[in-house]
């Protein structure tokens, strides 16, 4: 008989506890699979389209009945835990999270325009020139009647009133964070979207629901925008890579889907109507922004240029320019009449999450993960940025200019749970609004600046007036 004992025959005391441990060996062993699963989950992209693509590569079903986005990620993680080879392959794949990008030449290239795009650009030339002419004429008339004393008094009164806005209402509207709020053209209703993928329309003064929750998207909703000339049509975008066009009817009490805009390959973070209402712009994590025909839902333009995902975009009031903000910490100005890049604005150290044009037509504000708001004057190409605001102690999630007064006020929100109000003359902070118990993701301001709405991680929409 051998005096040795085989390794597999060694007795294991599962109830043993170390001198500094409160857990037994059995308890620790039970936790190991969970810890491994969490480690794998951290390496898996959040975008549902990427998760489905990886499942397809592994020859697994992309979708299982009654499975939501998070359950699909967990299923992928469990598959990867079983097959270490597949895990290694995925770990070696580049650009899976948009963090690594192959180095390419920065040489500009052009593709032939379709007949639809040529027709759209001809319209945009005439439309933007006429809008610009009217805006400049209005500015000249205002200058001729300008009274310094009255102007200063009016601005001080308006800024003080804006800074003294108070919380007037709050409504819990979803089971997950509110990621988008948007006031209708007449400010009578507000549309909300959440990370649960649901849409809802509320009365903007009472916050009472006017529609049932509509499970419109799979995954997080990125943005909502109303048609500039209509109070019953809006668009939304989300993590599922889709833009959806809805018709809202107060009488029928619901939202009706008019169609989908399909083309982006990854999550869509922002969507905006062109000032004419004839076109739609979208920003996506597939490193492109795109221009669509609002009536036919046809893609007119696919614009590359950013090295990482595009998170936000905004149209200039004349309709000639668009500003895109990217995860590469750059914002870029594009002339959509010609398809050329006009300017690159570099001033953030972290990704840009929000972009907004002033109604004056020559200032654009960008907010980023560095907590800074940069305000650029595009008339001063050589001088670059006009001013830098140390706005929030964390991520700046949204910036908005006031509308009817020509952008005399700038409002922002961020992950420090605050809404800040700034004067566009001095860029000094005039006040802060505190009321959210968690991070704020989105806000919108009424046309006359008499009230604003906001939403965030506390799953509520709040009214300030």
UniProtKB/Swiss-Prot annotation:
Entry keyword annotation includes Repeat: yes
Coiled-coil boundaries: none
WD repeat copies, ranges: 173-212, 216-256, 263-302, 305-344, 347-386, 391-432, 435-464
Superkingdom of origin: Eukaryota
Chief place of localization: nucleus
InterPro entries: G-protein_beta_WD-40_rep, PRP4-like, WD40/YVTN_repeat-like_dom_sf, WD40_repeat_CS, WD40_repeat_dom_sf, WD40_rpt
Subcellular location: Nucleus
Record-linked Pfam families: WD40 (PF00400)
Keywords noted in UniProt: mRNA processing, mRNA splicing, Nucleus, Repeat, Spliceosome, WD repeat
GO BP: any one term: spliceosomal conformational changes to generate catalytic conformation
Disulfide bonds: none
Record bears the keyword Transcription: no
GO molecular-function terms, A-Z: U4 snRNA binding; U6 snRNA binding
Alphabetized SMART domains for the sequence: SFM, WD40
Signal peptide positions on this chain: none
Cellular component per GO, a single term: U4 snRNP
Job description of the protein: Involved in RNA splicing. Is required for the association of U4/U6 snRNP with U5 snRNP in an early step of spliceosome assembly.
Further remark: Present with 1770 molecules/cell in log phase SD medium.
Subunit structure of this chain's protein: Component of the U4/U6-U5 tri-snRNP complex composed of the U4, U6 and U5 snRNAs and at least PRP3, PRP4, PRP6, PRP8, PRP18, PRP31, PRP38, SNU13, SNU23, SNU66, SNU114, SPP381, SMB1, SMD1, SMD2, SMD3, SMX2, SMX3, LSM2, LSM3, LSM4, LSM5, LSM6, LSM7, LSM8, BRR2 and DIB1.
Annotated protein name in UniProt: U4/U6 small nuclear ribonucleoprotein PRP4
């Amino acid at each position: 008989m051998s005096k040795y004992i085989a390794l597999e025959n060694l007795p294991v005391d599962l109830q043993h506890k170390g001198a500094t441990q409160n857990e037994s060996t059995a308890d620790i062993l039970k936790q190991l699979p969970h810890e491994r699963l969490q480690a794998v989950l951290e390496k898996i992209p959040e975008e549902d389209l990427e998760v489905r693509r990886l499942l397809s590569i592994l020859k697994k079903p992309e979708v299982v009945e009654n499975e939501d986005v998070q359950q699909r990620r967990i299923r992928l993680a469990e598959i990867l835990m079983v097959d270490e080879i597949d895990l290694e392959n995925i770990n070696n794949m580049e650009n899976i999270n948009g963090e690594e990008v192959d180095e390419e030449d920065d040489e500009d290239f052009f593709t032939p325009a379709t007949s639809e795009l040529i027709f759209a650009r001809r319209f945009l030339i005439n439309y933007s020139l006429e809008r610009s002419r009217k805006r400049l004429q209005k500015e000249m008339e205002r200058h001729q009647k300008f009274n310094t004393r009255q102007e200063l008094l009016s601005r001080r009164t308006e800024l003080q009133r804006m800074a003294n806005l108070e919380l007037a209402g709050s409504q819990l509207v979803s089971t997950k964070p509110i990621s988008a709020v948007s006031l209708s053209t007449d400010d009578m209703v507000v549309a909300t979207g959440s990370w649960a993928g649901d849409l809802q329309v509320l009365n903007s003064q009472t916050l009472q629901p006017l529609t049932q929750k509509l499970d419109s998207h799979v995954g997080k909703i990125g943005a909502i925008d109303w048609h500039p000339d209509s109070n019953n049509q809006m668009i939304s975008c989300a993590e599922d890579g889709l833009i959806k066009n809805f018709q809202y009817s107060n009488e029928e009490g619901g939202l009706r889907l008019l169609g989908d805009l399909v083309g982006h390959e990854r999550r869509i973070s922002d969507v905006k109507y062109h000032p004419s209402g004839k076109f739609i712009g979208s920003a996506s994590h597939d490193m492109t922004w795109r221009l669509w025909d609002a009536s036919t839902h046809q893609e007119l333009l696919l614009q590359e240029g950013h090295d990482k995902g595009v998170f936000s975009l905004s149209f200039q009031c004349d309709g000639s320019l668009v500003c895109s903000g990217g995860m590469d910490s750059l914002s870029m100005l594009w002339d959509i009449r010609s398809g050329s890049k006009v300017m690159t604005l570099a001033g953030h150290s972290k990704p840009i999450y929000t972009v907004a044009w002033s109604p004056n037509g020559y200032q654009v504000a960008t907010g980023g993960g560095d907590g800074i708001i940069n305000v650029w004057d595009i008339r001063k190409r050589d001088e670059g940025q006009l001013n830098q605001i140390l706005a929030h102690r964390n991520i700046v999630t949204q910036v908005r200019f006031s509308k009817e007064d020509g952008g005399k006020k700038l409002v922002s929100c961020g992950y420090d749970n605050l809404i800040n109000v700034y004067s566009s003359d001095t860029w000094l902070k005039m006040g802060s609004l505190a009321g959210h118990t968690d991070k704020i993701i989105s806000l919108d301001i009424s046309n006359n600046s008499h009230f604003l709405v906001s939403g965030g991680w506390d799953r509520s929409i709040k009214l300030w007036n």
